[in-house]
Amino acid sequence: MKLSAITLDCADPLALAAFYQQATGLEPHPKSDADFAALEGDNGLSLAFQRVDDHRPPGWPDPAVPQQLHCCFRVTDLDEAETRLLKLGAGKPEHQPNAGRWRVLTDPAGHPFCIVGGLAEPE
């Protein structure tokens, strides 16, 4: 068995796909539409987004609407990546459990995700 996609529920799949496309540089799937959009990774793993009409974004941390999954992205420079992602529309929750090693951000649909320092520059 091989993992082929991670899919996030949201109200606007194309808008959320555009955010993650700008954030990651992944290529949009050519058949993306208003109900289901995807970005394709080089390794065959897709990041996908499906429309849910009454989507309620998870909170961080919020037991009333807890996160059920989050993605972590390794970056070269935490501060630079945070600044860039905030300009793209990410949010930054007040609760940051270890801001020196990673940062918790939220995408425009409210899903928490982390950026983690330590990505080596390509040779």
Predicted regions: what they are:
Residues 54-60, 123:
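A short, acidic/glycine-rich surface segment
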